[in-house]
Structures are given as structure tokens and as C-alpha cells.
């Protein structure tokens, strides 16, 4: 959920890249409140290290439950807005991977309408891996 304590812990981790795939759990309001601190803390202690933000995927039950659909949409909008603000502030080496129905729309990619099953995770890998690898390649990371 991008708590400040997690951001403070990440500053001490020596990583080649940071992939932020934490959007399914925080509310849109928490995303707005916490994203800046998380990214700015990572950037302060890890200059030149890529930070890859992954937009939340639409939960399968969001296709039939308007409240879930609206929450997922607002989460994504809040995350993209924070990304854009960070870029305007001049944060370097920051990337955004947008959702493109990551777990599918056929209701086969989830165990419960929310959590991906093996097929859902496989679909996420198919969508995210090529994008992540292109970013990492820019930094000589294989």
C-alpha cells in the first residue's frame, strides 16, 4: 500500500531496478497521498536506478460490478496522474507501464474475480515482461 515505512526501508536496498506493482490494494486517495513520497525516497537514495510503475489491472469482477470498476478506474487515474506529476518535477529514470487487460477479459484469468490464477499471471508476464526488459536493457540489465 506504499506506506512511508516501506519507502524508508527500500532506501537501504541495493537493487538494479525498482518495480512498483502495488496498485491493487491502496485506495485512489492513498495512491495520491503516498506515491510521491515512495518514488522521491527511492530516487533520493538510488539516483540513476530505473523505477518502473505498473498501473493496476481491471479486476475481472469489475466488468460486472460497477463499484469495483469505478474503484479500479480511479486507482489507475490516480497512479497515472502521480506519474505525470513526478515527470513534471523532473524525476529521471521513471517509467509507467499501462494496463491493457493484463489478466484478460474472458473471466479465466482469476480465481475469484480479483486475484490472478496461473493463467492470469501468465498473461501478466506476456504483457509486462517485454516492456520491462526494454527498459532494463537501456541500463545494461539482462
Label for each model-derived stretch:
Residues 2-45, 56-63:
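Oxyanion-hole/transition-state-stabilizing segment in secreted/luminal serine hydrolases
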Residues 14-18, 47-51, 91-94:
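Loop/turn elements at helix/coil->beta-strand transitions in domains of secreted/extracellular proteins
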Residues 31, 35, 79, 121:
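Aromatic/hydrophobic pocket-lining residues that form the small-molecule binding cavity
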Residues 40-47, 84, 129, 133, ...:
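Sec-exported extracytoplasmic/periplasmic mature domains
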Residues 43-74, 97-106:
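Active-site segments of SGNH/GDSL-like serine hydrolases
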Residues 112-142:
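Histidine-centered active-site loop/cap adjacent to the catalytic His
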